[in-house]
Amino acid sequence: MIPTYMNIMLAFTISLLGMLIYRSHLMASLLCLEGMMMSLFIMTTLIALNTRSPLTNIMPIILLVFAACEAAVGLALLVSISNTYGLDYIHNLNLLQC
C-alpha cells in the first residue's frame, strides 16, 4: 500500500479513536468528526485523480457538501447547548427534546 494512503487511513483512525475517547464533550466530538471527514475527502480526491473516471470526479464535492452541512448543524447544536446549560456535554442533548 502506498504510504500516502496509509497516512490518510492513520489520520482517519486517530480521529475515530478521538471520537470514541472524547464522546462526552460535543466540541471534541465535532473536531474529531471534522478530522474524519477531511481524511475521507482527501482519500476520495486521490482515488478520483488516480482512476480518472468522470463518475468519480463529483464524489469529493458531494462529500464536502455533506461535511459543511454536518458542521453547520453541529455548531448550531453546540451554541444551543452552551447558551442553555453553559456546558458542552452530549448528555444535555436529551434535555433539548420537547
Swiss-Prot record:
Q: Where in the cell is it found?
A: Mitochondrion inner membrane
Q: What class of enzyme is it?
A: translocase
Single GO MF descriptor: NADH dehydrogenase (ubiquinone) activity
- InterPro entries tied to this protein: NADH_UbQ_OxRdtase_chain4L/K (IPR001133), NUOK/Mnh_C1-like (IPR039428)
Q: Which reaction does it catalyse?
A: a ubiquinone + NADH + 5 H(+)(in) = a ubiquinol + NAD(+) + 4 H(+)(out)
Instruction: Report the principal subcellular site.
Output: mitochondrion
Q: Supply one GO CC term from the record.
A: respiratory chain complex I
Instruction: Report TM segments.
Output: 1-21, 29-49, 61-81
Q: What is the effect of changing residue 94 to S?
A: In strain: Isolate 704
Membrane topology type: Multi-pass membrane protein
Q: Which UniProt keywords apply?
A: Electron transport, Membrane, Mitochondrion, Mitochondrion inner membrane, NAD, Respiratory chain, Translocase, Transmembrane, Transmembrane helix, Transport, Ubiquinone
E.C. numbers? 7.1.1.2
Give the domain of life: Eukaryota
* GO BP terms: ATP synthesis coupled electron transport
The entry assigns this protein to a family as follows: Belongs to the complex I subunit 4L family.
Subunit structure and binding partners: Core subunit of respiratory chain NADH dehydrogenase (Complex I) which is composed of 45 different subunits.
What is the purpose of this protein? Core subunit of the mitochondrial membrane respiratory chain NADH dehydrogenase (Complex I) which catalyzes electron transfer from NADH through the respiratory chain, using ubiquinone as an electron acceptor. Part of the enzyme membrane arm which is embedded in the lipid bilayer and involved in proton translocation.
Which protein is depicted?
NADH-ubiquinone oxidoreductase chain 4L
Question: Gene encoding this polypeptide?
Answer: MT-ND4L
